Swiss-Prot record:
GO terms for biological process: COPII-coated vesicle cargo loading; endoplasmic reticulum to Golgi vesicle-mediated transport; intracellular protein transport. Keywords: Cytoplasm, Cytoplasmic vesicle, Endoplasmic reticulum, ER-Golgi transport, Membrane, Metal-binding, Protein transport, Transport, Zinc. This is Protein transport protein Sec24A. Component of the coat protein complex II (COPII) which promotes the formation of transport vesicles from the endoplasmic reticulum (ER). The coat has two main functions, the physical deformation of the endoplasmic reticulum membrane into vesicles and the selection of cargo molecules for their transport to the Golgi complex. Plays a central role in cargo selection within the COPII complex and together with SEC24B may have a different specificity compared to SEC24C and SEC24D. May package preferentially cargos with cytoplasmic DxE or LxxLE motifs and may also recognize conformational epitopes. Gelsolin-like repeats lie at residues 972-1044. COPII is composed of at least five proteins: the Sec23/24 complex, the Sec13/31 complex and Sar1. Interacts with TMED2. Interacts (as part of the Sec23/24 complex) with SEC22B; recruits SEC22B into COPII-coated vesicles for its transport from the endoplasmic reticulum to the Golgi. Interacts with STING1; promoting STING1 translocation to COPII vesicles in a STEEP1-dependent manner. Interacts with TMEM39A. Interacts with SACM1L; this interaction is reduced in the absence of TMEM39A. Its main location: membrane. Pfam families: Gelsolin, Sec23_BS, Sec23_helical, Sec23_trunk, zf-Sec23_Sec24. Belongs to the SEC23/SEC24 family. SEC24 subfamily. It comes from Bos taurus.
Amino acid sequence: MSQPGIPASGGSSTGLQAQNGAASASGSPYTNGPVQNALMSSQVSVSQGYNSQLPGSYPHLIPAKTLNPVSGQSNSGGSQTVSPLSNYQGPGQALYGPPVASHPVTPSLHSGPSPQMPLPTSQNPAATPMPSGSFLPGASVSSPSNWQYNYLSQTNHCPRASSQPTMTGNTNLMSPQYVSSGDSSLQNNIIKSGSALPLVNPPLPTTFQPGAPLGPPPTGGPPPVRALTPQKLTPRTMPQPSFNSTSNQEGIISNTNNGSMVVHNNYDEIEGGGFLATSQPTTKNPTMSRSVGYSYPSLPPGYQNTAPPSTTGAGLPPSSLNYPSGPQAFTQTPLGANHLTSSMSGLSLHPEGLRVINLLQERNMLPSTPLQPPVPNLHEDIQKLNCNPELFRCTLTSIPQTQALLNKAKLPLGLLLHPFKDLVQLPVVTSSTIVRCRSCRTYINPFVSFLDQRRWKCNLCYRVNDVPEEFMYNPLTRVYGEPHRRPEVQNATIEFMAPSEYMLRPPQPPVYLFVFDVSHNAIETGYLNSVCQSLLDNLDLLPGNTRTKIGFITFDSTIHFYSLQEGLSQPQMLIVSDIEDVFIPMPENLLVNLNESKELVQDLLKTLPQMFTKTLETQSALGPALQAAFKLMSPTGGRMSVFQTQLPTLGVGALKPREEPNQRSSAKEIHLTPSTDFYKKLALDCSGQQVAVDLFLLSGQYSDLASLGCISRYSAGSVYYYPSYHHQHNPIQVQKLEKELQRYLTRKIGFEAVMRIRCTKGLSIHTFHGNFFVRSTDLLSLPNVNPDAGYAVQMSVEESLTDTQLVSFQSALLYTSSKGERRIRVHTLCLPVVSTLNEVFLGADVQAISGLLANMAVDRSVTASLSDARDALVNAVIDSLSAYRSSALSNQQPGLMVPFSLRLFPLFVLALLKQKSFQTGTNARLDERIFAMCQVKNQPLVYLMLTTHPSLYRVDNLSDEGAISINDRTIPQPPILQLSVEKLSRDGAFLMDAGSVLMLWVGRNCGQNFLSQVLGVENYALIPQTMTDLPELDTPESARTIAFISWLREQRPFYPILYVIRDESPMKANFLQNMVEDRTESALSYYEFLLHIQQQVNK
């Protein structure tokens, strides 16, 4: 029988909030119906205030990750302890206390000769200090290990090429971090069209102990997710309820204290933390035979995200819509455990997954199409309902039974989330009853089990719950008595319209405040013209409704406010020169209703760029301006967009230059940590008042982004960086700013959000990565959520999962849409539990592992040093491959033997070592390195991997063979090439997609056809040195090339600039710098790196 939708065990923290925009009530409890398993990229409706058109697909099918500053005073932040409410925590902080299914960890890091990253173990980590240099705070582990596993690893030495110092010291990248959530996507009817979904494993018959107050023994088949075994939930292990009731909501209340607002934990209560006073008996889960492989439906090249073919029109009444029939009725024969076992006996794992590869002999392992995530080894009926890996992804798709087994594998266990991703199809439920577990507060999901029509068992804590009367009726089929066919139980990603008990106050209106630097340096760059024009062009597209408010502040050595009160003939400037004691003049006229004062707003935007053209003021009072903006927004909350062009020089928050160009390569001398805690403290105040701060830094000089970035990191904001911005001297940056502003201003947004991740009893979350503040042990505060933000979490196995066959993770994002609706977006992921090392390696997701390690390495760079982080990355490869060689390989062979799943692990780690965040040498300016680290912490995984390991294509011979079709466009799909000059030829043209930049290298002997039909020049010498756009020519070659580049650019958080590079162009050095497999001035080639790894593994 089908299993209703209780949230799967908490996994990665992903924003589960629904997209902005009210759902249109159509008389049925549900609005816009979902399309079966179509939870990929989505298009957002114009009515929601977002961009009406979203890109059709990502070039890679990986959840992206957003940039997150690290906790503490560092930009990339180290872990911090979570303390009482008053003490805020930011990304990359360790959680302390009794979180739901969380594991306490010790954040202290001891520096030492051999830095390591221990993984958390089942014992109390607080009792055991972490090994020196370890990334992961947590319990001590007996065996040596990497930062990934929360245990110590042995020292390894890695020789470096040329000037590169040798990599010594054992480093582990396992440190706690917190994840934040993203914005919601387009809502769709929960009504689906298409064929019925296959039956999910029904629950096994359960025998109840005498006296159990839960009624007669249930009948039916085995639960699809978990076997029914009685397990006692102790206060230590039981997850706490988190979302329901007024006392359990995902919201935050602010009270006044000493003149400022203080955040209280009420949102924690709304989301649901804590258990009911009355204990409820739970039943044991009989062991169920292991489910076997089902693979995701194949996706077109380039991970095309398109809606399923037969999407039913939203205008049709529920009765006329064809929702896939879920599990069979209870009267039918259930799919029991015996049936499952026999049906799976003939299945076997794909032989390719068991291949052992010698990387020294098989070096060309990079696939020619985008790398797809591994498919969990689950029964087909369960896998069909699983969460899309673009939204929710685990580093290990087979969860080890014990922490000892995880430690033995020496691979990091964690989740990567893209919770608020734009979706084409999103089921939205408008029912007044949200069904949740009464004990752990998990939302009903496809992986719960129905004992009968009146009771369901939670797949996270195993409590048996009653099915509410309203849940018995299925509005899609208009049939009573089919709770297992409800949308909540048929969709791993779903959005709920939250009732009043999920609100601590009326939903806040959309409030947008813009803070502009108007000093002489700022006016010289000319940025104000571009920003004001972009605002004018997109004013009507700002997400919101009739309550939308807007305001403006400018500053140099003083602060300027602008009264936009309705009835004024023109905006009035109010100047506050006392920056030591900032006050708000006429606060009621500074944030005004956009609809009522639109003409005044437009007048101000047209005149602002000219108002300061003759200014001679060179000072910058950024700190006081931020304080003023915070005071202005405190009563309502909202989004603050700050534009800064230089180092702050006046008042609180003033900074001094710290960069020394000659010491850029000195890992111990570079300043990756903040020089003041002012910006972090202010960010925490902002978070408490539901204010997020987005920073746009446009500067040609050092501006201490390590310090300034804290204002966004801890308030769940974003950082945008435009080095050497100038409207005349650097026009390409002007184009980039305008494109990114257009997306920034019009994308959907969620306000006053909180996110919580739950997981099956026995697993615990100990570290979050991303831009947010950890309000209480496991509740992430997100004043704003957006669809371009990614998050990651680290986990450990706290209790043995021996009696558990399946585990689940569930993230819940509660937020207010731009239309003023309170919504909850829930993602649930189900994975199998395994008992052998081979199975753990078989299910390893190398991209997710690399993304999590990158986040941990950023923290290590800040808390220890850049060299420690680099060593830890190398040791991550050495330790895992050593574990495989010693424990999983039946016979020892010469060479570097790796399991097929990890064949790209050394390549991706080498790419990380050469990425701007971690590379050595004097090429990278300090602010550029810090910004790269911000991107690692805040970008979804798909973009992080593109930035780390770019995709290289040959484009002078594009054809329609193998092309995909998106919205009547034909998109060529050239094969992906290895990043080595061996793959280049002077008679071709090669395009490199590095995420935030595109580079088109044209060989000196490139064919005349490409030059004339695509570039529009007669010969090679006529290619402009500064060409950044391709001409739109009326030729098939031009159309194919432009279509391919446009497709790559779609739906990127950052607009990728295109550089056309001639063979002798200065930009060629940047192009070759991304050739990861080749030797550079300070890094080994891929083959040399493999030899080093082999030497260490064979020791």
